């Protein structure tokens, strides 16, 4: 085991905050070894010689699991072909490895998804955008502090956008209300209201 002396991170789903471990002075082989070891329940990334492991809290899971429900409802409504990619590990050896909370390809399946979604309770942000830029993910959504921000990749890097390019009827400031309800309400109720809103 690569780092068993420092694991497990607390994976108690009653924790309200994510648990994060950062390991400096690592290389790509260390990262690959970690991915091959048995550390279930963690999201892992590699960038600039640092491996980051995150054990999601229950609130993190609630938010990350509402996105697939809303995106599936949108794609059914507008007959958009989509391919869920979940937290599939994205790699550009030997620079970057990243596991998003949720990811999707639209139209056709692809090695690099069209959309990656990050739920941020305790870490992430600008550095994660740089990881996605190197990976070439066209669109990234960040949920943080009950706010939702859409970013689109261009020649100068990511720029904030109000309306999704991947799902062009979704506006960040409108969608976030449905996402935040995932903390306290049943997904069935949220999906029903979302379906009415996008008709």
Residue ranges and their predicted role:
Residues 40-41, 48, 99, 113:
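A structure-centric signal for secondary-structure junctions around beta-strands
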Residues 41-43, 140, 150:
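Short, surface-exposed charged micro-motifs
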Residues 46-48, 85:
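Short Gly/Ser/Thr- and Asp/Glu-enriched loop/turn motifs at secondary-structure junctions
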Residues 1-45:
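Polyampholytic, low-complexity intrinsically disordered segments
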Residues 51-54, 117:
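Short hydrophobic-aromatic micro-motifs
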Residues 2-18, 68-74, 78-135, 142-199:
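C-terminal interaction segment
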């Amino acid at each position: 085991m690569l780092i068993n002396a420092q694991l497990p991170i607390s994976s108690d789903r009653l924790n309200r905050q994510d648990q994060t471990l950062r390991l400096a002075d690592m290389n790509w082989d260390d990262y690959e070894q970690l991915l091959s070891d048995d550390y279930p329940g963690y999201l892992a990334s590699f960038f600039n010689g640092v491996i980051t492991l995150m054990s999601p809290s229950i609130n993190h899971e609630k938010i990350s699991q509402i996105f697939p429900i809303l995106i599936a409802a949108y794609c059914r409504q507008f007959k958009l072909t989509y391919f869920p990619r979940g937290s599939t590990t994205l790699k550009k050896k030997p620079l970057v490895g990243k596991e998003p909370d949720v990811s999707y390809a639209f139209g056709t399946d692809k090695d690099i998804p069209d959309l990656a979604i990050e739920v941020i309770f305790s870490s992430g942000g600008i550095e994660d955008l740089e990881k996605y830029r190197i990976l070439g993910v066209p669109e990234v959504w960040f949920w943080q502090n009950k706010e939702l921000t859409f970013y689109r990749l261009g020649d100068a890097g990511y720029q904030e956008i109000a309306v999704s390019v991947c799902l062009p009827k979704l506006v960040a400031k409108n969608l976030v209300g449905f996402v935040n309800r995932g903390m306290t309400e049943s997904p069935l109720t949220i999906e029903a209201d979302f379906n009415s809103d996008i008709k």
